[in-house]
Amino acid sequence: MFGTIKKIIKDKGFGFITPDDGTDEVFFHRSRLSPKVYFEDLREGDEVQFDVRPGEKGPQAFNLRPR
């Protein structure tokens, strides 16, 4: 799946992605990034690729990487 990082909460270690397909925002956590992708390097507006799985409060991204 592809999308754009909408919001990053650096001090909490998570953020939200707006998927390109128009579906609901997807939560991501720093612990679910692809290897060699560093949370500190991510910026709002970055285009990313990711996989999605159901989470406790909605869809969650994992294997997050730059597009």
Language-model features: locations:
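Absolute protein N-terminus
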Residues: 1-2, 67
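Compositionally biased, low-complexity repeat tracts
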Residues: 18, 51-54
